[in-house]
Amino acid sequence: MSIATIPVSSLRRAPAPTTAPQAPLRWQVEDIAALYELPFMDLLFRAQQVHREHFDANEVQLSTLLSIKTGGCAEDCGYCPQSTHFETEVKASKLMPLAEVIEAARAAKDQGATRFCMGAAWRSPKERDMERVTEIVREVRSLGLETCMTLGMLQAEQAQALKDAGLDYYNHNLDSAPEFYGDIISTRTYQDRLDTLGHVRQAGINVCCGGIVGMGESRLQRAGLIAQLANLSPYPESVPINNLVPVAGTPLANTAPLDPFEFVRTIAVARITMPLTMVRLSAGREQMDEALQALCFAAGANSIFYGDKLLTTSNPQADRDRQLFERLGLKTQGARPAAQQAQ
């Protein structure tokens, strides 16, 4: 199964889905750019209306992210300190032993997480790795947690093996609009990413796919990223929106920060164009104050990464998140029994 990059000229609107993302909106990039141009309060109001139509606006889903294999990646993603192309403080490690993964998963569940996401810094997993990662999926899922993995590019048979092990979600981000992508990455094509998403869909695994903003892209290119995500068929069940965390030693280390209101606009536009997805605040949340996070929730974000670290970057401490939720009157989404996951 292959997914092609969507030409701007071919995108047309269709009726909005009402019960499931199987019939997604078809958006022109210019239409999404027009949403960005709305007065800030009008955009938030529209996003909040869409959000309340499909979700409890006071409920947030908690995911925890663990790096099960850090560093040593052959890709040259300009934002990533795990790349072997750049001199950073990240040290390469081998795949984490199963017992350590399970210990971390239990701790995440005890703190209220309902989904446990595991990342390995590979271009793609080798066959010798697949037996170990599928065992990890089975064991984590047996704890009653939803499971998500990001392992790089997948072949169809690898996606099927993960499905057979019970994987609920696979994360593979598009990162940016096609027009900006080549400025950030040269070792993996945009079509490579789309092909992996196609294999994941064909295997029957839920898709977690988002991108990174604040890498120096234009507003129109941010709109282009949202268009690519919203026009996947179906659009992702989970959309993580990352705000660049510049890391010393990477090509993007000195990138100027994105205007905070522009980040909130991106959350709102993602909610409007993908009304049934879980929009997740991801990397960069540590750099946001509580007022900015509250605006993001008002704009339609309904999921966060929960815990002190995201792969190699810091994240707000769990106690701070709980205090913020209490002050905002937010509740956390309960876990589903394992038997109900990835049906």
From Swiss-Prot:
Keyword tags: 2Fe-2S, 4Fe-4S, Biotin biosynthesis, Iron, Iron-sulfur, Metal-binding, S-adenosyl-L-methionine, Transferase
Cofactor, how bound (note): Binds 1 [4Fe-4S] cluster. The cluster is coordinated with 3 cysteines and an exchangeable S-adenosyl-L-methionine.
Necessary cofactors: [4Fe-4S] cluster; [2Fe-2S] cluster
Catalytic function, reaction form: (4R,5S)-dethiobiotin + (sulfur carrier)-SH + 2 reduced [2Fe-2S]-[ferredoxin] + 2 S-adenosyl-L-methionine = (sulfur carrier)-H + biotin + 2 5'-deoxyadenosine + 2 L-methionine + 2 oxidized [2Fe-2S]-[ferredoxin]
Positions contributing to [4Fe-4S] cluster binding: C73, C77, C80
Domain Radical SAM core, chain residue ranges per copy: 58-285
Protein family: Belongs to the radical SAM superfamily. Biotin synthase family.
Protein name from the UniProt record: Biotin synthase 2
Lineage: Bacteria, Pseudomonadati, Pseudomonadota, Betaproteobacteria, Burkholderiales
Underlying gene: bioB2
